[in-house]
């Protein structure tokens, strides 16, 4: 078979390690602090700030195998997936990078050595392309490597010039192609396998290119594509890490791959999308109706729709998660940790969407019937988009169903609706991200960095390195000014990992600065945000930095309690529980976790009891620093969407809890004192939230609750342990009284029928119509139900005016509902009342803004009924 995909990955990373590159583990699919991207879609994305000069790494050469997802924006492969042999949503990108170290010659040498000597690709089958004006790259390939000129293609800017954006770093690129033989045509014969980008210019706003002082290298080789070449496969979907998923699709559908194009498309979609949703959800992206979650939901539903086309009508994708995890857990051990969680989320999504899928078919049939009845030849863009967006149907399937009925679809209108939706999605996720301000980038250029010493110290003598006032770097801050101070060392913890920043005082004998918050706007820079209360503080001053100790202790109690809570949830609810977000403040903690149903009172009680039990045991809280992979192998839990370095801190609470964490903690669980859950709620599909307190704040809340309980028991005249029973009794009494009141209202309304409702004969029909004041819609329906049963050929039109608006009901006797369709009548009558409505054939209701038009609407109804014959 040649090399396996796992072997190729390891060969690549090992090769570049031997060339002095640092192996960097894949970043999560969710990019960190990048407002331009929904997902990491290229190997260079985690290094973007390094290329931009905003971040420094302890190495100048790196190599990685990066998880990527291309589903939106410029690199949107979603709708192509399944129809071609190469497009994927999820893929792995092998890359080597140089940050101002080596350049073209070495990059080309390394690439050539790897493909010819390690992968053993025949030199005579390899071609390269260069940018048409890049003479340097041409000469290296031709004269130094020895590739004849006829196998070097000069291509234009569209093919061989890379740029990060309209402005910023850019440069020519060079690509390596393999000739697969004369039996293939076009791109399938000359298959691009590696792209080398020579980042050597900066493009300004006028389009002018200026050479960079330290040019960079960024290369990318798609693992799936090179595996298909080395394994002799015609399609990426036939390689060893994907084809088992094709076989899974065959098994659950009963279809065979390779017999029919439509079947092959569906099986490829299922295989690709299974990988995408497994990795994305494992990285903490929960399916939802906005932002990243919306994209993952669309991918999941697209796979289900294609499964539906194969005749699969029950949830099935969740069964394939195990296969993805088993294939990919060696290079990505985090998949094993989240296996059960991902399966639970996917199964829940499938169960909900199966119902939607069926109702979606009903919706499409409904809009087709409507179009035909109106004499239209086309389904509108909005109708198509609703089927696509709400019910998750692919456009080509909608087109196919419409074509069977002799209809076309408005693709242009659909695209407009789709663009509007994409814009809404872009806005929804941009809000959550923040870019590095130029002032912080400038500080880094000046070589200013801060070191955190707050694990060991809450007070520290140190030097002022920088001061910012109003986004400007200044030499001093004066009394009354608000600003930011950067210290050489700081005991103040900057907000991160869910923990809020410290507050306190920075002072000298000349000035006092009150620190209200501490942040890390970019790697290496810690800013103390606040106000100068007295005097002045200048750059180079030696200051005394003092953290608010009591507040820090409150935060530490809450942070360690968060770890105990996480462990308790996993212990009592199951291993599927994973942290999905947290906030560790001074007065409370907030913990979001993955679970599929609300917690019962008994579960909440048991969780609270278990955490307090571990607090009473006074477990030692230990801190160890180790390599990331080593930490995972010890059983430490890594948190979704958190970015970890090569070395990590492992926080252990005895044997009960072990997590990767950079936050501050107490030295023993007994220091927490007391833990109390304040609330439990939902924050989205498959995600629950617990708010809790510890220490003095928990005691205060418990005292306030007891005081309130005492007041309530006194007001009710019962003992404290009888309060709940008394409240339940009062609720029952109120419910009974409300029933009596409702019954009396119905009787009064029945009496008002004679006064308010008129009766008229229209051929075989009897029409009842009239207007009431302040009658609820449900009461209107009840009255209409009574009136339509009088003769068996009754039509009812009654309404209620309230606060300048009107609610109305149209009903017909059930025996005549096919001839007198209330849902059609109400749409036309509703227009007169400046509103609308809908419902069943025998009963429909609506609302409008023109109560004074009731008589006019009655007149229209009579005209409509004049042409009705019920026999």
From Swiss-Prot:
The cofactor note from the UniProt entry for this protein is: Binds 1 zinc ion per subunit.
GO annotation terms (biological process):
alanyl-tRNA aminoacylation
Keyword Membrane found: no
Q: What does this protein do?
A: Catalyzes the attachment of alanine to tRNA(Ala) in a two-step reaction: alanine is first activated by ATP to form Ala-AMP and then transferred to the acceptor end of tRNA(Ala). Also edits incorrectly charged Ser-tRNA(Ala) and Gly-tRNA(Ala) via its editing domain.
Catalyzed reactions per annotation: tRNA(Ala) + L-alanine + ATP = L-alanyl-tRNA(Ala) + AMP + diphosphate
Q: Which domain of life is it from?
A: Bacteria
- Entry keywords, A to Z: Aminoacyl-tRNA synthetase, ATP-binding, Cytoplasm, Ligase, Metal-binding, Nucleotide-binding, Protein biosynthesis, RNA-binding, tRNA-binding, Zinc
Which InterPro entries does this one have?
A: aa-tRNA-synth_II/BPL/LPL, Ala-tRNA-lgiase_IIc, Ala-tRNA-ligase_IIc_anticod-bd, Ala-tRNA-synth_IIc_core, Ala-tRNA-synth_IIc_N, Ala-tRNA_ligase, Ala_tRNA_ligase_euk/bac, DHHA1_dom
Subcellular localization, per the record?
A: Cytoplasm
One of the entry's Gene Ontology molecular-function terms is: aminoacyl-tRNA deacylase activity
Its required cofactor(s), as named, are: Zn(2+)
Binding of Zn(2+): at which residues?
559, 563, 661, 665
Show the GO cellular component annotation of the record.
Answer: cytosol
Protein name, entry field: Alanine--tRNA ligase
Q: Which Pfam families does its entry note?
A: DHHA1, tRNA-synt_2c, tRNA_SAD
Which NCBIfam families does its entry note? alaS (TIGR00344)
Keyword Cell membrane (UniProt): no
Record-listed E.C. numbers: 6.1.1.7
- Broadest EC class assigned to this enzyme: ligase
Disulphide bridges: none
The record's similarity note reads: Belongs to the class-II aminoacyl-tRNA synthetase family.
Main location class: cytoplasm
Tell what the record comments on domains: Consists of three domains; the N-terminal catalytic domain, the editing domain and the C-terminal C-Ala domain. The editing domain removes incorrectly charged amino acids, while the C-Ala domain, along with tRNA(Ala), serves as a bridge to cooperatively bring together the editing and aminoacylation centers thus stimulating deacylation of misacylated tRNAs.
């Amino acid at each position: 078979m040649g090399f396996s995909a796992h072997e190729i990955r390891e060969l690549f990373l090992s090769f570049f390690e031997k060339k002095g590159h640092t192996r960097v583990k894949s970043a999560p699919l969710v990019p960190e602090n990048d407002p331009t991207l929904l997902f990491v879609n290229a190997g260079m994305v985690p290094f973007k700030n390094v290329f931009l000069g905003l971040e420094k790494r302890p190495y100048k050469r790196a190599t990685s195998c990066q998880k990527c997802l291309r589903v939106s924006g410029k690199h949107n492969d979603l709708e192509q997936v399944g129809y071609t042999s190469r497009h994927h949503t999820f893929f792995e990108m092998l890359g080597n990078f140089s940050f101002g170290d080596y350049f073209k010659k070495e990059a080309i040498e390394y690439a050539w050595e790897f493909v010819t000597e390690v992968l053993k690709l025949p030199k005579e089958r390899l071609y390269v392309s260069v940018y048409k004006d890049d003479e340097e790259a041409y000469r290296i390939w031709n004269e130094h490597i020895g590739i004849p000129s006829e196998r070097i293609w000069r291509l234009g800017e569209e093919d061989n010039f890379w740029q990060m954006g309209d402005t910023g770093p850019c440069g020519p690129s060079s690509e390596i192609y393999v000739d697969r033989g004369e039996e293939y045509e076009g791109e399938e014969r000359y298959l691009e396998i590696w792209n080398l980008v020579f980042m050597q210019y900066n493009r300004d706003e006028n389009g002018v290119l200026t050479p960079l002082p330290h040019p960079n290298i960024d290369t990318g080789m798609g693992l799936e594509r090179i595996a298909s070449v080395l394994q002799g496969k015609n399609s990426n979907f036939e390689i060893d890490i994907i084809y088992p998923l094709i076989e899974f699709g065959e098994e659950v559908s009963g279809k065979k791959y390779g017999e029919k194009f439509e079947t092959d498309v569906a099986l490829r979609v299922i295989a690709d999308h299974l990988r995408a949703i497994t990795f994305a959800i494992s990285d903490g992206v929960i399916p939802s109706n906005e932002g990243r979650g919306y994209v993952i939901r669309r991918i999941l539903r697209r796979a289900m729709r294609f499964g539906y086309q194969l005749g699969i009508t029950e949830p099935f994708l969740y069964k394939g998660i195990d296969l993805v995890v088993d294939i990919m857990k060696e290079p990505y051990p985090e998949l094993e940790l989240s296996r059960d969680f991902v399966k639970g989320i996917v199964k829940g999504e499938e169960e909900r969407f199966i119902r939607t899928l069926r109702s979606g078919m009903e919706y499409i049939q409904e809009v087709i019937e409507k179009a035909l009845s109106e004499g239209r030849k086309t389904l509108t863009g909005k109708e198509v988009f609703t089927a696509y967006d709400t019910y998750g149907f692919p456009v080509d399937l909608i087109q196919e169903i419409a074509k069977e009925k002799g209809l076309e679809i408005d693709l242009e209108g659909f695209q407009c609706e789709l663009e509007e939706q994409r814009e809404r999605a872009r806005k929804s996720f941009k809000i959550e991200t923040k870019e590095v301000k130029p002032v912080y980038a400038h500080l880094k250029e000046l070589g200013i960095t801060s070191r955190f010493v707050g694990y060991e110290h809450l007070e520290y003598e140190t030097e002022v390195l920088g001061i910012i006032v109003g986004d400007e770097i200044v030499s001093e801050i004066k009394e009354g000014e608000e600003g930011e101070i950067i210290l050489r060392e700081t005991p103040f913890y900057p907000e991160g990992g869910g923990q809020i920043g410290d507050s306190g005082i920075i002072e000298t004998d000349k000035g006092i600065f009150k620190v209200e918050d501490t942040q890390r706007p970019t790697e290496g820079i810690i800013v103390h945000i606040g106000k100068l209360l007295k005097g002045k503080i200048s750059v180079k001053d030696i200051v005394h930095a003092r953290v608010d100790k009591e507040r820090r202790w409150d935060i530490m109690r809450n942070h360690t309690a968060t770890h105990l809570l996480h462990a308790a949830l996993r212990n009592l609810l199951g291993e599927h529980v994973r942290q999905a977000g947290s906030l560790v403040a001074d007065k409370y903690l907030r913990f979001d976790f993955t679970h599929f149903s609300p917690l019962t009172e008994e579960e909440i009680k048991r969780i609270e009891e278990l955490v307090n039990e571990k607090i009473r045991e006074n477990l030692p809280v230990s801190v160890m620093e180790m390599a990331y992979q080593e930490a995972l192998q010890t059983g430490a839990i890594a948190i979704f969407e958190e970015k970890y370095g090569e070395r990590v801190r492992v926080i252990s609470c005895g044997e009960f809890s072990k997590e990767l964490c950079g936050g501050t903690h107490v030295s023993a669980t007994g220091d927490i004192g007391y833990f109390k859950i304040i609330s439990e709620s939902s924050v989205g599909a498959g995600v629950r939230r617990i708010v809790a307190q510890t220490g003095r704040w928990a005691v205060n809340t418990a005292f306030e609750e007891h005081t309130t309980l005492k007041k309530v028991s006194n007001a009710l005249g019962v003992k404290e342990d009888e309060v709940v029973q008394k409240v339940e009794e009062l609720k029952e009494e109120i419910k009974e009284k409300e029933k009596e009141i409702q019954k009396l209202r119905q009787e009064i309304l029945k009496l008002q029928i004679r006064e308010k409702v008129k009766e008229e004969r229209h051929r075989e029909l009897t029409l009842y119509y009239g207007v009431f004041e302040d009658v609820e819609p449900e009461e209107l329906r009840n009255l209409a139900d009574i009136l339509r049963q009088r003769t068996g050929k009754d039509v009812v039109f009654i309404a209620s005016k309230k606060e300048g608006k009107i609610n109305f009901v149209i009903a017909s006797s059930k025996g005549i509902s096919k001839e007198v369709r209330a849902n059609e009548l109400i749409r036309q009558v509703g227009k007169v009342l400046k509103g609308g409505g809908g419902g069943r054939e025998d009963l429909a209701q609506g609302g409008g803004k023109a109560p004074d038009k009731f008589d006019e609407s009655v007149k229209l109804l009579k005209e409509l009924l004049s042409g009705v014959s019920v026999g």
